[in-house]
């Protein structure tokens, strides 16, 4: 049986075109995942999700047995990711889950926390 060479229809190494995905979309999702990819931050978010009122940073330090600078570091990451808001009351800072989270983020959190 003779071996026949098949004609090349596509360029070598290119099977099909990828669907268009905006780089900014991927960067935003990756930043969100980075913020969520820590057990302490997930615990903080779960506490804020279940709370009826803002929570003082001092309550997190006592409840999680971590130092205030460590909790502040985690809160900064969550704030940068757009997940929490804060307000200063005297010498303490109180945190709450951001009211206007994107629907997709809220759904993701509800699945992670519920």
Give the predicted meaning of each segment.
Residues 46, 72-76, 91:
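Base-recognition residues in the alpha-helical recognition helix of bacterial helix-turn-helix
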Residues 27-67, 93-100:
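N-terminal helix-turn-helix DNA-binding core of bacterial DNA-binding proteins
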Residues 110-114:
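Short hydrophobic/aromatic patches at helix-to-coil boundaries
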């Amino acid at each position: 049986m003779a071996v026949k060479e098949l004609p090349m229809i596509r360029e070598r190494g290119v099977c099909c075109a990828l669907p268009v995905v905006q780089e900014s979309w991927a960067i935003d999702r990756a930043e969100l995942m980075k913020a969520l990819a820590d057990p302490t931050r997930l615990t903080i978010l779960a506490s804020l999700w279940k709370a009826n009122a803002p929570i003082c940073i001092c309550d997190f330090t006592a409840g999680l047995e971590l130092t205030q600078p460590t909790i502040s570091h985690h809160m900064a990451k969550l704030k940068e990711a757009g997940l929490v808001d804060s307000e200063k009351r005297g010498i303490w800072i109180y945190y709450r889950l951001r009211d206007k989270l994107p629907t997709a983020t809220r759904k993701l959190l509800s699945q992670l926390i519920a």
